[in-house]
Amino acid sequence: MIYETRTVTREILDGLKKNNYTRRIKSHFMAYGTEYDFLRFFIIEENGEETGVISVFNSAMMISTFEEKTLSDAALDELAGVVSMIMPLQIEMESSYGKKLFSLVGDDYNCDKRTEFAFVSKNELPDMNVDELPKLDDVFRILAQSFPSIRDSYELWLTDTSHRVRRGLSQSFLLGDYTTATIQYIIDGVALVGHVATVPEERGKFHARRLLYWIGERLKRDGFEVRLFARPHRVSYYEEIGFRAVGVDHVLERKINDE
């Protein structure tokens, strides 16, 4: 059985497996709680036991299971039904279930492979002039040139990002006026790097590479583990910077109408 709930607590979420999906769910909960319509939580229950939690933040679905719990084929069938009703733009879940779910909803979704990376520190923080508290409009100006989904959602992006930054759940970095990177969450001692971009006229000059390495060393010095995800064509790039592959998963993305 899968049912929506507003009784999620931090204690409940602490019982989930320690992975990216759990940290994503926690970051949403810690940012907004359970009182907003744009953030919904569901419990997966089998044989009277809670086996997992689902969050749907705007149009992104995140799924994680409790420690020592697994999802049966019947639970995945029911999950596919929930997906068909909600039709999220993106679905992320543990690697052991991603392709199984895709086999059930593949008519509406594409399945893309990702590699998860962890930063390997050399304990050498470069001397760089990085703005750790940039104006978010300056960050947006750069991101908008690389991410159409952000470009077309300025108010939503600004509201959510500033909300999370104020609560210490996210942070943006700016190198000069040309390269930026954002920490998408800082949860349970892990920082997830995402949304790295450089303005077109400065690309190819290794700005993003230098900023990512600096962020890795800076956050490691503060005691955080630094992670990021990359699609197959970017794997060697992150390995060269100093990131080590630690896992693979599959992300489901809803097909656009003309596919």
Feature-to-residue mapping (PLM):
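Short amphipathic alpha-helix that is part of the acyltransferase structural core
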Residues: 1-26, 112-156
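Conserved donor-binding loop and adjoining core beta-sheet/short helix segment
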Residues: 27-87, 177-195, 200
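Conserved acetyl-CoA-binding loop-helix of GNAT-fold acetyltransferases
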Residues: 71-82, 198, 204-221, 230, ...
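Conserved GNAT acetyl-CoA-binding A-motif
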Residues: 85-95, 219-231
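A mid-sequence, solvent-exposed acidic-amphipathic segment
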Residues: 137-192, 197
